[in-house]
């Protein structure tokens, strides 16, 4: 029930963000602050030495600030808002594709960092991302090209790397979730780990 309630709440927030940019300011503020606190908590539990902990926290703070700032600035333009929306769909598709294909086909593990990740899941992630991005881009532009496949592959691979990175940190910190901010889902970073890297890499590519 908690997971369903959280999903509905996030859907409502997404719709508000699309229609009203004012809502985006508050969402990004909460997202930034909570994500930073979750990251710092992870680093603290891993018990790096003070220098590495400081560098890690500073780097992530700068990264989050740039991510949220650019996200907000681009959202002021309808064309970029559509692009961001499509990229977010791609990141979500990557996550869902990995989960579904991994559950159905199972097979060899992808890495020790995250035992639940399989090669089948990684391939499924790319396949579903290609399908979803192709449909979304065709819907908005009535046009398709091979570039869509390239963008989809970059999106999926980037999301999977982001996911694995935070899985590595959680494994080192010996925790299941980065937090409990989202009931039934864990912390914000548990839901947006892939998006943080996926959207950033895509925007650089575009």
PLM segments and residue spans:
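Juxtamembrane/transmembrane-helix interface segments of polytopic membrane transporters
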Residues: 133-137, 171, 202, 206
